[in-house]
A protein has these predicted regions:
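Structural motif
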Residues: 57, 61, 133-134, 167, ...
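Active-site groove signature of glycoside hydrolases
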Residues: 131-151
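Short, acidic/polar
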Residues: 45-58, 118-134, 182-186
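Alpha-helix N-cap and loop-to-helix initiation/capping positions
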Residues: 46-50, 78, 82, 114-122, ...
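N-terminal small/glycine-rich loop or linker at the start of catalytic domains
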Residues: 25-43, 101-115, 138, 143
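Beta/alpha (TIM)-barrel catalytic core signal, keyed to glycine-rich beta->alpha loops juxtaposed to Asp/Glu
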Residues: 3-18, 147-332, 337, 347-348
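N-terminal binding-site loop/beta-alpha segment at the start of enzyme catalytic domains
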Residues: 1-98
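Short acidic capping loops at alpha-helix termini that bridge into adjacent secondary structure
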Residues: 32-33, 67, 93-98, 137-141, ...
Length: 348
């Protein structure tokens, strides 16, 4: 794949372009209110030049956090490899302005040690591979991507602690852990002397499981929160207002089961879209602002298939406030849509 070879110089006004930065829990680290996730759109099925344009635009608008995982693609590993190529080409001079994260927890390579989980062997080896793919000496944040009930939590957290002490990550986090397991993880890491920086759960208007006890837990423990899938795998965009378009995630059965797009579910989405229009926002912009209404949420992770889509999402930051009446009206339609694919991890 090819990419632009012209010299990239970051916009001089990138920190005056409307980005909001929030403190991550009780740490000393700030994150942008909207971060760029590379779960989709950065594999080998997307032209490298398009990926490059998205990364350049994101940084030019003050997005300093890029979130990856070992298995992002397709194929597995390709998002990290492509990011590494573009980082070396465009972003290496700005390394100290960036927060780059990766994760490990799902199947990645053949044999018993690459099938995922939370073993020390898998996590350390996986991060070493990620660093090699991205051409980095360290990541800023490394996550346990899921809770593994077959591995002692002490081993998983011990691996994260040793990764920090080895200089391979500055901070550590967890993803899709329940409230009680999060408290356990915090306690184990605290005893080791390595604080848990951040939790990455799925959270959106149509997937509100974190409100049961996780957000309270994170606040109590001083842990930040970065919400992934805040647009409900695309349901909270204009994409599905009139059905399932060709090429969409639902049409391709990628992370969004088309069976979930029932008449009832779409009626709620259309009602929310009407409220967004009254606010002068797109549905996606209102959905992002809604996730960020709670100051316990440090950042919302968005994906982008184009510069235009990225810009639309970032423009959510111009209108973050809601009236009590607006929130009450939204609650009538912000109902569970059965889209939490990660519930098996957070159910323990």
């Amino acid at each position: 794949m090819t990419y632009r070879v012209d010299e990239y110089r970051a916009a001089s006004d990138r920190y005056d372009a409307g980005m909001v930065y929030r403190r991550c829990g009780r740490s000393g680290l700030d994150l942008p209110a909207i971060s760029l996730g590379l779960w989709h759109n950065f594999g080998d099925d997307v032209p490298l030049e398009r990926q490059q344009a998205i990364l350049r635009r994101a940084f030019d608008r003050g997005v300093t956090h890029f979130d990856l995982a070992n298995n992002y693609g397709p194929p597995y590993g390709s998002a990290e490899r492509n990011f590494g190529t573009l980082f070396a080409r465009d972003l290496r001079p700005y390394r100290d302005e960036l927060i780059i994260s990766s994760k490990a927890g799902y199947d990645m390579w053949p044999g018993p040690y690459g099938q995922g989980g939370g073993s020390r062997k898998y996590l350390v080896a996986s991060l070493d591979q990620s660093l090699q793919r991205m051409g980095l000496d360290y990541v800023d944040i490394f996550y346990s991507h899921r809770f593994d009930e077959t591995t002692p939590l002490e081993e998983t957290m011990g691996a994260l602690d040793s990764i920090v002490r080895a200089g391979k990550a500055l901070y550590v986090g967890i993803s899709s852990y329940s409230g009680p397991r999060t408290r356990e993880a915090v306690a184990i890491l605290r005893e080791m002397g390595t604080p848990l920086l951040i939790h990455q759960p799925s959270y959106s208007m149509l997937n509100r499981w974190v409100e049961e006890d996780l957000l309270d837990t994170l606040e109590d423990e001083g842990v930040g929160c970065i919400a992934f899938s805040p647009l409900a795998q695309g349901m909270l965009t204009s994409k599905y207002l009139d059905g399932v378009p060709a090429g969409s995630r639902a049409a391709q059965d990628k992370s969004l089961d088309p069976a979930l797009l029932t008449d009832g579910a779409l009626a709620h989405v259309r009602a929310l879209n009407g409220m967004a229009q009254e606010r002068g926002q797109t549905l996606a912009q209102m959905a992002l602002a809604w996730v960020l209404r709670d100051d316990r949420v440090t950042s919302a992770l968005v994906g982008a298939s184009s510069v235009e889509q990225l810009d639309d999402n970032l423009d959510a930051l111009t209108t973050l406030d809601f009236s009590d009446d607006e929130l009450a009206a939204i609650d009538q339609h912000a109902v569970d849509a059965g889209i939490n694919l990660w519930a098996p991890s957070s159910s323990h």
